[in-house]
């Protein structure tokens, strides 16, 4: 339906509402058309008018709750979901939506409670088990997350979301071979999935399988989509395998892909610092500083390079800049004080020797 047809449908429905102001079907129809036109303020207004006619319209309560949920107005969402629960305490969608809302609010006990209530009414939906797994995943209980992802897959063996997330959980549990097993399944089902190709490549890198690792990075880069992250991950792998020149070139490609992002410059600087090319490292960090002028950690990185290159006075100035930006950061202060004390001690030692 194009814009012109949509406007005609809206006009026609408004006319029907004028003729039958208590017919809630017309309100649902008008709300649907406004939603198709992305006029969500009008959708809300129509639904609120509908509730004045029928305060127990379950679909309206659920729809309003969902609109506020996706607007990240979680307290407003809960208001309507709670009303929906009073209207129909046996509707699993009510509990599922409440659980999702509490999950966004990081309220683990209530989210888990309402997911379990959802299962009381719908125990065969893999998406509910996925959601519970994700809840445990977010709260870093990877063992429980794994169990629920496996339950989701027992109900839907080709559920791509569960396969990817289960691979991620296995990776975090250091079960890299199992992670690869799930990633490979996804890539077989969706060979154009760039993210999964990267997951496979990164896992192969951890497993020290250089040849296959590089092969999957090349596959990921060849797939459509932004390659900034792919170049960075590939560069890190190249660096880990001591292919430093290739790594440096990949960081350059990452910069070309997104010149306004500092991370590639910082990682490139770290690479040069690790191989003792301090001037090159300094240059990369200063490029990052042009993007994030007020980021104290970059000043610390520059200071570290100066210190390793035996430019102690310059390192002191950079450490002090970081401390001035984050005076509450004890780590910055401790490093600054230690370097300053060492510098003063060396300076005085020279004076004492000269006096003799």
PLM region descriptions:
Residues 24-25, 58-59, 92-93, 126-127, ...:
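Helix-start (N-cap) detector for alpha-helical repeat units in TPR-like alpha-solenoids
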Residues 28, 35, 62, 69, ...:
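Position-specific recognition of the canonical hydrophobic site in helix A of tetratricopeptide repeat
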Residues 29, 63, 97, 131, ...:
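Canonical tetratricopeptide repeat
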Residues 307-344, 352-356:
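TPR/TPR-like (Sel1-like) alpha-helical repeat modules
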């Amino acid at each position: 339906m194009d814009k012109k047809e949509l406007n005609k449908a809206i006009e026609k429905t408004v006319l029907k509402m004028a003729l039958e102001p208590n017919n809630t079907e017309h309100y649902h129809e008008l709300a649907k058309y406004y939603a198709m036109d992305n006029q969500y303020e009008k959708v809300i207004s129509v639904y609120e008018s509908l509730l004045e006619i029928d305060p127990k319209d379950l679909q309206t309560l659920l729809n309003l709750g969902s609109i506020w949920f996706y607007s990240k107005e979680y307290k407003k969402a809960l208001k309507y979901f709670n009303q929906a629960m009073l209207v129909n305490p046996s509707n699993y969608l009510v509990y599922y939506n409440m659980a999702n809302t509490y999950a966004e609010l990081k309220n683990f006990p209530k989210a888990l409670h309402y997911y379990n209530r959802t299962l009381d009414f719908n125990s065969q939906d893999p998406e509910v088990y996925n959601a519970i797994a994700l809840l445990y995943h977010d709260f870093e209980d990877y063992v429980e997350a794994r169990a629920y992802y496996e339950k989701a897959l027992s109900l839907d063996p080709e559920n791509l979301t569960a396969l990817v997330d289960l691979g991620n959980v296995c990776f975090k549990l250091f079960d890299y071979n199992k992670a690869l097993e799930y990633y490979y399944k996804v890539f077989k089902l969706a060979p154009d999935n760039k993210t999964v190709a990267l997951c496979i490549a990164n896992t192969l890198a951890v497993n020290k399988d250089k040849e296959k690792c590089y092969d999957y990075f090349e596959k990921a880069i060849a797939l459509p989509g932004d390659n900034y992250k792919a170049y960075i991950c590939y560069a890190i792998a190249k660096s880990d395998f001591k292919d430093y020149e290739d790594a440096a070139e990949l960081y350059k490609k990452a910069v070309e892909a997104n010149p306004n992002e500092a991370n590639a410059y910082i990682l490139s600087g770290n690479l040069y610092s690790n191989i003792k090319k301090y001037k090159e490292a300094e240059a990369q960090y200063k490029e990052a500083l042009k993007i994030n002028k007020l980021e104290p950690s970059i000043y610390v990185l520059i200071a570290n390079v100066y210190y390793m290159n035996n430019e102690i006075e310059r390192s002191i100035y950079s450490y002090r800049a970081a401390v001035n930006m984050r005076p509450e950061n004890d780590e910055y202060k401790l490093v600054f004080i230690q370097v300053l004390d060492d510098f003063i001690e060396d300076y005085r030692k020279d004076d004492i020797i000269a006096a003799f």
